[in-house]
Amino acid sequence: MSSYLLDTSALLTLRGNEAGAERVAELLREASTGKTECHGCFITLMEVLYRVWKNEGEAAGRGAYASCLKLPIIWLHESPALLERAASIKATHPLSFADAWIAASALELGATLVHKDPEFETLPGLLEERLPYKQ
């Protein structure tokens, strides 16, 4: 079975109905029927909450967070192995703190990372599905 990890950018793409939203929706439909697995990193939940809160207000942020929890996503939470992998990535690659956790999660699971973030392109061994980048 195929396994995908949805980056924060993928979930915000879906929420904003941006280019690539249909692909994210397709993966979630497949996950809901057991055809594939969709995963998410715990840090993505925080990113969705704070980004939407900052741009649209607290109620919208909390609503977006609650919506994420209802999606057919298996959420990966912090563990010692994941922490070490994220720290190694952060120490050796020019990624943000959150992106290091997200990349580590995809690598830990052997999942394809679905994203809109060119910074992920530099990581060796990371399976990627790139959504259309913003122009």
Functional labels for PLM-detected ranges:
Residues 51-54, 72:
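Helix-loop "lid/cap" segments that line or gate small-molecule binding pockets
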Residues 1-3, 103-135:
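Acidic, PIN/NYN-like endoribonuclease modules and their adjacent C-terminal/linker elements
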Residues 32, 69, 107:
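Anion (oxyanion) recognition and catalysis
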Residues 1-40, 53-66, 134-135:
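Short, well-structured N-terminal submotif of metal-dependent ribonuclease cores
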Residues 11-12, 45, 120-121:
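A generic structural signal for short hydrophobic patches within well-formed alpha-helices
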Residues 73-116:
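Active-site neighborhoods of divalent-metal-dependent phosphate/nucleic-acid chemistry enzymes
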